[in-house]
Every structure is written in C-alpha cells, then in structure tokens.
C-alpha cells in the first residue's frame, strides 16, 4: 500500500472472533473474550501502522462486523440489542470525530460512502445514506422464527 498513489479499495475480513475462538494470544482466561481482545489488538496495530503512511490523510477505513457475535452469552435472540452492531469510519479523510446513533444495516454502507464522496448511489436501491437526516432510519433483520 505504501507505493500505491492511485485510489484503491480493499476488503479484509477477519474470523478470529468466531468459533472456535482459538487465537495466538493469551491475555484473558475466557476463550471468547480473549479472541475479541486479540481482534481488537490486531485492528489497533493495523490502524497505528496505517497512520504512518502518506495515504492516511486521504483514507477512510470502514470497520463493520458481520453480526453481533457470541457475547454476551445470555443475550435474548429476540432483543433489539442482539442486532445492533457498530459501523466505524476511521482515517485521515474524516474531518472530526463524532458519534451518530441511527438504525441501518450493512446494505446501507454503499449509499452512505458514495454520498460522502458526492457520487450517485441511486442504483443501490436497497441502500440508504445513514448520514442523511432525511433518510428513513431502520434496519431489516431475519432469523429463524423472527424478522423485523
């Protein structure tokens, strides 16, 4: 990446915070929490190293999980909390830190990012700009015996 002067798009997916929770890291006795701590440390190291590259100033890194996960173990499958996941936008191209509490889903990432770049996103008919206050803020979910 250090030699790349042209805009680029990359995807990196981790699976260290998924079962069987076996990671090369031993900080916590609970295997699940230890795997989450390992993932957090790797993400932190990645961002720390990327900040040192010249591309950082023009970069947006998107962090989003595929689903909530396996913790807390007692969380009810019918609870809204079970389906709330973070979307983090990090990078030198982000003007200032802020927290925005709206409902959305992974489908909405495309329209949200394209809108920030002032690019058309109408062809993404199932995606909405989560940062637009006029957008309807909802998220669809479906699991066995439950949807909403």
Residue ranges and their predicted role:
Residues 1-148:
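Solvent-exposed soluble domains appended to multi-pass membrane proteins
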């Amino acid at each position: 990446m250090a030699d790349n002067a042209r805009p680029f798009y990359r995807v990196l997916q981790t699976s260290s915070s998924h079962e069987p929770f076996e990671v090369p890291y031993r900080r916590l006795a609970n295997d699940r929490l230890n795997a989450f701590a390992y993932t957090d440390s790797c993400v932190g190291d990645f961002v720390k190293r990327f900040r040192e590259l010249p591309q950082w100033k023009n970069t947006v890194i998107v962090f989003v999980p595929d689903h909530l996960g396996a913790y807390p173990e007692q969380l009810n499958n019918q609870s809204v909390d079970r389906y709330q996941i973070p979307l983090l936008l990090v990078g030198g191209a982000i003007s200032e830190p802020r927290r925005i509490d709206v409902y959305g889903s992974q489908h909405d990432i495309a329209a949200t990012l394209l809108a920030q770049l002032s690019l058309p996103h109408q062809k993404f008919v199932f995606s909405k700009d989560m940062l637009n206050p006029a957008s309807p803020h909802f998220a669809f979910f479906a699991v066995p015996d439950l949807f909403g």
